[in-house]
Amino acid sequence: APSGSGNQLVCNSGTISNLVATGTSILWYANTTGGSPLNPTTALVNGTTYYASQTLSSCESRNRYQLAVTITNPALPTSAGNQSVCQTNPIQTLIPVATSPDGGTITWYNAPTGGSLIAAPTWNTIGSTTFYAQNNNNSCTSTARTPVTLEIKAAPLLTITNTTCAANLLTYS
């Protein structure tokens, strides 16, 4: 029979083709004995045990390796909301805030998918930008990212026109 850890964590979803066992020509089954091999595109079910055989020299093993599957789906990060403030002097620095509802850690990116990791996102420029929070839990990541927009509005310029009036002095008697 093939070998392995006995347990496998799968992120978000998966298929039979995502299962891992050490051996040659692995076939996966839903039962410890008998049955037909599962199609590699069969969706995995959380908490289900799958069974693997291997084929050597055209002979399939009678014993099957047992693998328990846990599917983890990290929740979307929860945002503290967008921030929009008016410029102060000196200009302030805004920091996006998001938390993991399931105890994971938050990483920040500059795009909703792909993009670059931003280790410590801040904004201290007139205008706006959006950072994207991703939840990481059990070596898995949330399927989407939560946007947080930071904006600093330019302070209005106050223009004062200095008008001087000529004084006409009056004498009363």
What feature does the model see in each segment?
Residues 1-173:
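Proline- and Ser/Thr-rich low-complexity, intrinsically disordered segments
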